[in-house]
């Protein structure tokens, strides 16, 4: 087990004048990021261990403790890279627990830059685990913490490092696909939570994915009656043939009501699987706007988020009727700055 109590105690003892961002105490940012990441994990239902996620969130910005970065936050001098130095702290925790978790290390190393191929990442960490490099990393950790007067309570034991290195060399390609998915989930949760906390988001705001209360229009002609029957038959067949997550197709002629049928089938599948969101993807911007209008009619304007290359920032969930006072809301800034999907339905 990783020494979570010791880490939490150490973080709580950091002086408040050690910042993550101007005026924001680093310890508060790390705890805030961890809390948001866990809330996102629970919402999305990804198969990522809460312990690993919290651990990497609590150390992901420790490289900012360096005196040069603190001076930069106060407008003095240039900043220095902090993501890679932050991985050194996580490496000590992994070695303390005899764990091999390159995905967590890489999530921190890449949370402000590009991702690296798995083979290259494993080569990088194999080199870092060499005895000479361990001594160099120990000195760098001490240098990073120098002005804080807070010695790091964990070390880089060579025996544990050798075991970690051996595992990398012998098992590097094991279950590559599932580990890649795990890495992408860890990275996504970390980056999203980190940005949210930096922008001032302290808790998640979201609407539930609720069934539409808009009934089908009353048939006034024979075509309307056919559409109603087609809607009923498609929904029944789709529900009966559903075998879990996968690819399903719906083929209907123009004018059959595919948009409404598609949304209702997607909602039925979401209810069967416990999904919290619908993502309705379309190939052309013109029909994205058209289908988004249908979705807003079905679910309400606040429950639908439009996302495409020509979209202008229009307040909460891109609602044209949004109050201008919402422009300073941290979550609204997150939505417009990073195109974060927060609404129950994204088109």
Residue ranges and their predicted role:
Residues 66, 115-121, 288-290, 314-324:
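Switch/connector loops and helix/strand junctions flanking conserved nucleotide-binding motifs
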Residues 275-299, 304-315:
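Conserved Walker A/P-loop ATP-binding site and its immediately adjacent core
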Residues 29, 217-251:
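Conserved pre-motif I regulatory segment
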Residues 85-89, 107, 265, 290-298:
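Alpha-helical scaffold elements adjacent to nucleotide-binding pockets in ATP/GTP-utilizing enzyme cores
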Residues 243-250, 275-277, 342-346:
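Pre-Walker A (Motif I) flank of P-loop NTPase domains
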Residues 2-216:
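Accessory nucleic-acid engagement/destabilization modules that flank
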Residues 242-269:
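Walker A/P-loop
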Residues 300-347:
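Inter-Walker segment of RecA-like/P-loop motor cores
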